[in-house]
């Protein structure tokens, strides 16, 4: 069970190839192609969100894939946090 005061961010939340119904929570323009758990973790650390990695977790809509998730501090809306993480990953990727 997750802690109170934490947001759950899945790689699927930032994945450009997914639909909104499939789990993406930010616009396609802001989203990423195939985000990795380690990228999410590094970006969250850079943003001082105190990420906790849960690599063995499976996204409910794709329960057959083990994508993992991160728990970050709940300082603002989940979509805002997701946009900041995606922007940081894009900068790290060089784009």
UniProtKB/Swiss-Prot annotation:
Keyword annotations of the record: Cytoplasm, Ribonucleoprotein, RNA-binding, Signal recognition particle
Molecular function GO labels: 7S RNA binding
Pfam family, one: SRP19
RNA-binding found in the keyword field: yes
InterPro entries: Signal_recog_particle_SRP19, SRP19-like_sf, SRP19_arc-type
Recorded superkingdom: Archaea
GO cellular component terms attached to this protein's record: signal recognition particle
Subcellular localization(s) per the UniProt record: Cytoplasm
Known function: Involved in targeting and insertion of nascent membrane proteins into the cytoplasmic membrane. Binds directly to 7S RNA and mediates binding of the 54 kDa subunit of the SRP.
The protein's assembly and partners: Part of the signal recognition particle protein translocation system, which is composed of SRP and FtsY. Archaeal SRP consists of a 7S RNA molecule of 300 nucleotides and two protein subunits: SRP54 and SRP19.
Family (UniProt): Belongs to the SRP19 family.
Name of the protein this chain belongs to: Signal recognition particle 19 kDa protein
């Amino acid at each position: 069970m997750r802690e109170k005061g934490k947001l759950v961010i899945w790689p699927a939340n930032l994945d450009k190839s997914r639909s909104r119904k499939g789990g993406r929570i930010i616009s396609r323009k802001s989203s990423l192609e195939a985000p990795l758990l380690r990228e999410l973790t590094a970006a969250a650390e850079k943003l001082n969100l105190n990420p906790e990695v849960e690599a063995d977790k499976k996204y409910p809509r794709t329960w057959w894939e083990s994508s993992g998730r991160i728990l970050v501090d709940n300082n603002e809306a989940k979509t805002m946090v997701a946009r900041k993480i995606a922007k940081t990953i894009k900068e790290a990727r060089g784009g």
